[in-house]
């Protein structure tokens, strides 16, 4: 366990953005270990969680800023974004509006954080009630962002957004975790068939993208 700041080789501010209810807080609090600390900053209306990841470059700390519901009040204060080194933008695949609002969140974020690594994450892919299909998720391709399906409640692909961000921030594409992230027991088990179906849909979407056949966000089928 890392107990002190001297053991940490790098420290980064990571902000979570997206509509309320998409699962941002659940996503962060899946990390269950003594190295996870959470504190509330009243002046900003946010929770800041400290997550230490053990990598091939040493221990790296993320200070993860979560909105604490402030996004429901009509936007976030600039102080939320200032000094951010990276961001995870999250939507809920069972709610179309949360995906349609992603361009607004991206605009707010990049107005202050122009060139930080950003991962777009579609949460709740464990649900059979998905309203946002892989071929409809096109925003990341237009903005050259990384995208991952995740399920906070089943821990599906939990590590991938963090590992991608770490590689970007350190400039080391070969960086890896030397210890898995300690996670809470799953609330929902995803079947192998569900996972295979997700992969098949994303392979199909990638092929369509290469052929220039993916719909725009404004496409009628998405509204």
UniProtKB/Swiss-Prot annotation:
Query: Which CDD domains has this protein been placed in?
Result: Ran (cd00877)
Q: One GO biological process from the UniProt record?
A: protein import into nucleus
Region called Switch-II, residue ranges: 69-85
Where GTP binds, per the record, is at 19-26, 69, 123-126, 151-153
MF terms from GO for this chain are:
GTP binding; GTPase activity
Give residue ranges for domain Small GTPase Ran-type: 8-172
Q: Which InterPro entries match?
A: P-loop_NTPase, Ran_GTPase, Small_GTP-bd, Small_GTPase
Residue span of region Switch-I:
38-46
- One of this protein's Pfam families, by short name? Ras
Question: Gene Ontology cellular component?
Answer: cytoplasm; nucleus
Q: Which residues cross the membrane?
A: none
Alphabetized PROSITE patterns for the sequence = RAN
Q: Main localization of the protein?
A: nucleus
Keyword terms, alphabetized = GTP-binding, Nucleotide-binding, Nucleus, Protein transport, Transport
* Subcellular location(s) of the protein: Nucleus
Q: So what family is this one in?
A: Belongs to the small GTPase superfamily. Ran family.
* Functional summary from the UniProt entry: GTP-binding protein involved in nucleocytoplasmic transport. Required for the import of protein into the nucleus and also for RNA export. Involved in chromatin condensation and control of cell cycle.
Subunit info here reads:
Monomer. Found in a nuclear export complex with RanGTP, exportin and pre-miRNA.
Task: Provide the protein name.
Answer: GTP-binding nuclear protein Ran
Tell me which species this is from: Tetrahymena pyriformis
């Amino acid at each position: 366990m890392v107990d002190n700041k001297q053991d940490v080789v790098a420290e980064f501010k990571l902000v979570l953005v997206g509509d309320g209810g998409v699962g941002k807080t659940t996503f962060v609090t899946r990390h269950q270990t003594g190295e996870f600390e959470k504190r509330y900053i009243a002046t900003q209306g946010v929770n800041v969680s400290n997550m230490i990841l053990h990598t091939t470059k040493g221990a790296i700390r993320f200070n993860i800023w979560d909105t604490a519901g402030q996004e429901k009040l009509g936007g976030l204060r600039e102080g939320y974004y200032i000094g951010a080194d990276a961001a995870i933008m999250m939507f809920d695949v069972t709610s179309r509006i949360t995906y349609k609002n992603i361009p607004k969140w991206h605009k707010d974020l990049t107005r202050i954080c122009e060139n930080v690594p950003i991962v777009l994450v579609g949460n709740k892919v464990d649900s059979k009630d998905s309203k946002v299909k892989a071929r409809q998720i096109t925003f990341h391709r237009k903005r050259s962002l990384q995208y991952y399906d995740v399920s906070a409640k089943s821990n599906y692909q939990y590590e991938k957004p963090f590992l991608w961000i770490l590689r970007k921030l350190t400039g080391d594409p070969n960086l890896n975790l030397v210890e898995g992230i300690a996670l809470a027991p799953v609330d929902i088990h995803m079947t192998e068939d569900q996972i295979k179906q997700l992969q098949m849909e994303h392979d199909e979407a990638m092929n369509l993208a290469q052929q220039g056949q993916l719909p725009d966000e404004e496409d009628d089928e998405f509204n």
